[in-house]
A protein has these predicted regions:
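Conserved active-site and SAM-binding loop architecture
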Residues: 1-191
Length: 191
């Protein structure tokens, strides 16, 4: 089993990074640090992983005094990069949070790191690749789930395309699920 001393999840959401590490059989002997500002996401993380050390806003990273960070994961806000959005790219202030990730990488110099984001315009992808010194791996979540979401992963960890599990929408549907208006009543009856 692989063991990491400390892990830092930036833009950590509901700490899916912790779920992934658990499923991969990777143990954290020290702390899992989370930088997240959404109160609902923090609540979910704290319920599922009560030992998570909440650091708050990445903009306060210079105040953090973390030691022996072996892994940094990040998936900065994607709205500015998304082809489905307005494509403001780095003109969207949320997109510039990518540079906070880069500064944090330089500050802690972890053994491993991973940055995830949406599929984007090629020139922006190239710009991010240039800054990180790595080309991304494009993975479509449709290979492992019942959704079609292409994501780019920049990392210094060797990764390969996952095997297609052949999961389709009907595989995840609850049989005989009532119409949406009755959904809450349905689940209340099951409790």
């Amino acid at each position: 089993m692989t063991t990491l001393r400390n892990v830092l999840g930036l833009f950590d959401g509901i700490s899916c990074g912790q779920v992934a590490l658990e499923r991969a059989g990777i143990e954290i002997e020290g702390a899992y640090y989370s930088s997240e500002i959404d109160e609902y996401a923090i609540t979910v993380t704290n319920r599922n992983y009560p030992d998570t050390v909440q650091l708050g806003d990445i903009k306060d990273r210079r105040d953090w005094d973390l030691k022996d960070v072996d892994l940094i994961t990040a998936g900065s806000p994607c709205q500015g990069f998304s082809i489905a959005g307005k494509r403001l790219n780095f003109k969207d202030p949320r997109s510039t949070l990518f540079f906070d990730f880069v500064d944090t990488l330089n500050q802690y110099n972890p053994k491993y790191w991973l940055f995830e984001n949406v599929r984007m315009r090629k020139d922006i992808e190239v710009a991010i690749s240039t800054v990180l010194g790595r080309e991304p791996v494009l993975i479509n979540s449709g290979l492992v789930s019942a959704q079609n979401r292409e994501r780019l992963y920049w990392t210094n960890i060797p990764i390969t395309q996952p095997e297609d599990k052949g999961i389709v929408f009907n595989d995840i549907m609850i049989p005989n699920l009532p119409p949406t208006g009755e959904l809450q009543e349905y689940f209340e009856e099951k409790e």
